[in-house]
Amino acid sequence: MNKVKLLAGASAAALAIIAAIFHVEGGYVNNPNDPGGPTHHGVTQAVAREHGYQGDMRDFPKELAQQVFFEDYILKPGFDQLIALSPAVGEEAVDSGVNAGPAQPSKWLQIALNSLNRRGRDYPDVTVDGRAGPATMAAYASLQRVRGRAEACRMIVKLMDAQQAGHYLRLAGDNSTYETFMPGWTINRIGNVPLEKCA
């Protein structure tokens, strides 16, 4: 499938999430404390190279960044299915994935779901494997049925934010160079999906 057609198949909610990520990520950066190295529109040089881009990252096109976000951070981890169930939870997962890798928010979602099923009374535990597949989506749909769409969304966003904050605190505690990024992560990544979006 050609890349333009693939992106054209993105839902309006997915495109809005990508636009929000661009707003947070900004343009070109090359912070010596960032192990990701040269980054443009939130895409690291290594990821750009995986997608066939060989030019200077200062010239990395926004259109290719959109495609990278859609393929690597929405389609591959299965977050397109999550966006269909709850755009706000989908945004939380995709945004977190861009910053921490897509497996990490998948695990946070799975841990949150397992903690909310009342010891399996509402739905079975899911395997915490970092792959948000059909069992994870079924568990989230069950949580929606039990708690209502808005409340399920608020509960998951809160628990994913809490885990993300803990992740950043561990990174900064283990490696003081990451402290450079803590203010930005705290301002732009924790609580950046307003609970009002769950309504």
Region locations from a protein language model:
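Cell-wall polysaccharide-cleaving catalytic domain and substrate-binding groove, primarily
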Residues: N2-A199
